[in-house]
Amino acid sequence: MGDYVPGFEQRESDNRSFGHSRLPTLGAIPIKNEKGQTVMQKVKVSRYVAGKAPEYARNYDSDSSESDRETDRDDDRRRRRRRESSDEEDRRRHRRHEDYGRRRQVEKPEVLGKVEDESSENEQESEEDEEKQEERRERARMRRLELHENNREKDEEQEDSAESDEEDFERRRQMLRDRAIKREEEIKREIKEELEEDDVEEEEEEESSEEEDSDEDDDPVPRLKPIFTRKKDRITLQEAEKEKEKEILKKIEDEKRAEERKRESAKLVEKVLQEEEAAEKRKTEDRVDLSSVLTDDETENMAYEAWKLREMKRLKRNRDEREEAAREKAELDKIHAMSEEERLKYLRLNPKVITNKQDKGKYKFLQKYFHRGAFFLDEEDEVLKRNFAEATNDDQFDKTILPKVMQVKNFGKASRTKYTHLTEEDTTDHQGVWASTNQLNSQFSTKRAGGSRPVFERPATKKRKN
C-alpha cells in the first residue's frame, strides 16, 4: 500500500519519520498499479487486539523480542511474589484478628465474699469499662488499618492487572471480589459478636447488681457465676400452664372430630345398604326371559331348522322370479305376433299396471319444480303417491299480480335471474353476435365448415398421393 494521502486529509503529525506509517482514514485510496494506471484500492483497517503484536512490529529483531519477553516474565514473577506476600500478610492478619476475638477467657465459678466497700467496687467497674472501651477502640483501629491496606492493595492489583492480559485480569478481579466479600462477612460477624457481648455484659451487670442487693444479709452466701440463657430457651410457669391448656383443648377437638367421623361413616353405610336394596328390587321387577336372548350355546338342531327355513324361502323366491320372467316373455311373443289393430285393441283392454302412479299436477306461475325420483318406485309406498306439483312456501302466493320487475326468481337476492322464463324470450333472433357475419365468423366457417374451404389441387395429383 502506498504512502499517498489526499491533501484535505494531510496533518502535520503525518510527516513524521519514526514509528509505523499512519494509515489513511478513507475506505479506498488511489494508487498506481504495475501498468502505471491509477486505480482505487480498499484500505484494510488494522485493529488492536490484546496480546497480539501489531503488523508494523513483526519485522523487528528476534533478540529484542526475546529480551522483552524475559523482562515481561520477570515483571510477572515480581507481581506474583508481591501478590503471594500480600495474601500471606492478609492470612496472618486475619489469624491474629481471630486469635484476638477468641482472647476472652471463660472463668470458672468462684465463691465471692461479702462486699464490704462499695466505692472500691465502683472503681473496679469503671476500670473494667475503660479497658473494654480501649479494646473496642483498638479493634476499630485495626479494622480501619485493614480497610486502608485492602484499598491500597486493590489499587496496586488494579495497576498490575491493567498491564497483564485479559485472563489474568479476570482471575485477579474474581479473587479480589471473593476476598472483599469474605472481609465484609468477617466484619459483620465481628460487629454482631460485639453487640452480643455488650448485651451479655449488660445482663450480667444487672444480675450482679441484683445479687449484690440480695447479698446484703448478715451471713455470707456462696454465689456462682450467672449463665446467660437465650429468650427462646427460657420457660416460665405461665408458659407451661398455657402449653397444658393448649394440649387439653387439642385433645377435646380430636375427640369431637373422631365422633363426627363415626357419624359420617354410619350414614355412609346406611346409604350403601339402601342403594343395594333398591338395586335388588329393580332386578326382580325388570327380570326378563333369558331364553329370548341369543347365545352361543344353541343346539345344532335349532340352527339346522333355521337354515332349512331360509333355504325354502330362497327357492320359492327364485321360482316365482323364473315364472314371472317366462310369463312376460310369452306375453311379448303374443303381442309381437299380432297385427297393428289387434295390438291396439289388446293394449286398450289390458292396460299396463304402474305402481305408485301419480297424475301430473299443474304448476303455478314461477313455481319451483321438484323431481320425485326414479329409483325404488316398484314398491307400493304412500309417500311416493303424493302430489309433487303442489305449491309450497312462497310458491303459494299468486306472482302474476306482482310488477314486471319483480316477476323473476329469487328477487332481491344475489342469486336472482335476469329472465322470467323461457317462453317469454325470443330465441329466433338473428341479430345476435353469433349470427352476424364478420371476419372472425368467416374465418371460422372457412376453416371448420365442410365444403367451404378452397382447394387448389388437381385430382390427378391427389390420386397419386393416395
Swiss-Prot record:
Regions of compositional bias (Basic and acidic residues) in chain numbering: 58-77, 97-117, 133-155, 169-192, 234-245
Chief place where the protein resides: nucleus
Coiled-coil region(s): none
Keyword Membrane among UniProt keywords: no
Compositionally biased tracts (Acidic residues): 118-132, 156-168, 193-219
Record's function text: Involved in pre-mRNA splicing.
Protein name according to UniProt: Microfibrillar-associated protein 1
Lineage: Eukaryota, Metazoa, Ecdysozoa, Nematoda, Chromadorea
